Amino acid sequence: REPSKDLLVSRLEVVTLPSRLPRGLPVKSCAQELQLPVHEWPNTGPVGQFDVGVVASFGRLLSEDLILQFPYGVLNVHPSFLPRWRGPAPIVHTILHGDTVTGVTIMEIRPKRFDVGPIIKQEEFAVPPHCTTKELEEILAKMGANMLLSVLKHLPESLENKKEQPKGGVTFAPKVSVAKSCIKWEEQTAAQVIRLHRAIGSMFPLQTLWKGSPVKLMDFVEVDNIPGFADQVLNDDEAVPGSLLYHKASQTLIARCKEGWVGIKTVVLKKKLRAVDFYNGYMHSWFQQSSRAVHQECRFQTLRLSPAKKTLKERN
């Protein structure tokens, strides 16, 4: 509310959530580096001294009393093309479900419910092939920042042109629990496993069972990108989901899914092992006679975890 002819924002303060990290969340570290005042939720700082509030992946419902402190309300920068993927983990679900188009929505915050307010500005974005959650997050963050600046430059006009969200096409993006990282070999296709890895693999490495022990799988590849793989599989129809082969030329483990096969470059058992080391240490004896045969005992099995365990959501 301090007039300025040159600056779009003349005064800025930051509210962040509590964190167990020594330095707090990244947004707090950034604010401190820029010497901005920082308040920790539920403390929201001075009352009635700001024109507009902005939240991004904040994860807390704002009261009507708090929203009314801002003459222009509170804006939310949401990384999806609403009403698709309302909720705390929209980018994860965009990748998980194989969406080819997403976007960013600048919307007006309403009390008591998440992501239901009117749309102020919205832009679509084509999801790049093979994109991960982390990569898409970086792209949409920059896109959202530019859109927010555009809205703030013409705030009264932007608010006048806001529109309610469509009632159709609503989907929800709930938090993802660590149980989601367990590959269900009998239920998931190769394409679904690859998408799961791209969606949560950088935060929750995918997990399975090997001879009763939990192992983590990393560095997945599509078998279409492995030259000569099709020639190796002779009894494809007989392979039980979870069955393993080793492709020597590319040094890749190949696991059977509900449909198709998926390549794996790294296994974490007691320590991180390359596929060739895992093969030499744990699989070699089965394949001495034929590297092409699928052995029923040589397989991963589905690990079951409680969904109530640790959860993941996108938050700054």
Give the residues covered by each predicted segment:
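Short, charged/polar surface micro-motifs in flexible loops or helix N-caps
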Residues: 100-101, 190-191, 215, 220-225
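Short acidic-hydrophobic surface loop/beta-edge motif
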Residues: 183, 206-211, 253-258
